[in-house]
Amino acid sequence: DAIDDSNRVVIIASSTRDGEEEKVLTAFKRVLESHPNTVLLLVPRHPERFDAVATLVGRMGLRLGRRSKNDLLTEEMQVYLGDSMGEMMSYYRLASIAFVGGSLVNTGCQNVLEPAAFGIPVVTGPSQFNFATICRQLEAESALRTVANEKELADFLIDLIPDWARQAEMGRRGKALVEHNQDSLPALLSLLEPLLAEPSSDA
């Protein structure tokens, strides 16, 4: 795949909403100053916004590739737009760290269990009302970090990117919580049934 063969550090921003991408991109520009080998895999929640988000990326001075155009990830590319349907689980497989969208705007975050099930550290903004219980559990296990704004998001990513041991530990704790709660969280985990049934990518 376009990103699979890259040695870049991939941060996914999944299911982002209108008004949120600009905040994430602002944070990511700061991340690039410290970690220029990082790429942002940006996956907006609504397909009708793909083109508008692509325009925003260009307006913010970031170099863009698009899944819909089968662009290959080059060294110059800074943002890769996941403008396709039905590939979120494949995108999570490629990522080192996941920001879950809907959380830096007041719409409520999307499903934080998805990246946790892949053993990826999770970060969200403060709007978590629709997954409040599981967010609290993940945070108590040090598998999820809540940030208040784009500045805190940038600070967290800048610190976490070079800390491979912490990434692995956050990911391990999140995946363990998902597995431990399979019986006690049936409603939430029903969302993950297709994912949990998939073979491991390194099998």
Label each region the model flagged.
Residues D1-A203:
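Nucleotide-activated sugar donor-binding and catalytic core shared by glycosyltransferases
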